[in-house]
């Protein structure tokens, strides 16, 4: 596997590590992450679904992302940070798949983090996660998941970045994104090819596999939330179709120091739809515990 180095955005302290959503490159979050650059060392990791030469079918469940994430973060600490065993040294921030990756990392290595911010973690109710785990060996999720077939049919080649941008600009899923955020998304996703056009850096096969394996490891999270002792802010979008009220309430209830926040006027793409407002909320949470 050809691992990609984290996108380094700043060289201040302390260390803030961000993990992206399924299909959304680190560059898409520039507007959201920019307000943090004066106060923190900001690194945005590329999850393995962006790494060249990786096979989606080798991933059984999302704990694979956790197992990639932890060595990366420890490497960043050795190079740029200073670990204090009693309080941790990293501010972990993630969106969607990235939030789940960050949370699972905190469960496995609870002393690593000062605090966590989880935006729209894709954590299902227990019954749904159990159902997906039982269906997985029979490969039935691929047939019934509402997003997988459309993902596999996605257009993967464009004449130019501008052509990609114009096609995406009219899609409902991106209607809440500003022009600048969408252009940052395209810039991070597009890669020039030998034909003179651009193709997707993030393959539909990987995106679909992530959908297919979602929920399989949820039991691991529900069983171990009480191990995450650092402060945790869980943010959901007011109009989300992913993170239900009862799920966030259960999460916050099981986390020793959990808080919930609902971002008005947003769906699942909270930090992309309202990046500056979301950054303001996150910065306020960090300041409450670090200052």
Predicted regions and their residues:
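Active-site loop/oxyanion-hole signature of alpha/beta-hydrolase fold enzymes
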Residues: 43, 47-93, 134-135, 280
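Conserved serine/cysteine hydrolase catalytic core
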Residues: 190-253, 262
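Catalytic histidine-centered segment of alpha/beta-hydrolase-like enzymes
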Residues: 266-275
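A short loop-to-beta-strand scaffold at the N-terminal edge of the catalytic core in hydrolase folds
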Residues: 1-8
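Conserved HGGG/HGGXW glycine-rich cap/lid loop of the alpha/beta-hydrolase fold
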Residues: 8-58, 72
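Short beta-to-alpha linker loops that shape the active-site pocket of alpha/beta-hydrolase fold enzymes
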Residues: 46-51, 122, 266-267
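Conserved alpha/beta-hydrolase catalytic His-Asp/Glu region
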Residues: 152-209
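Conserved hydrolase catalytic core segment
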Residues: 89-131
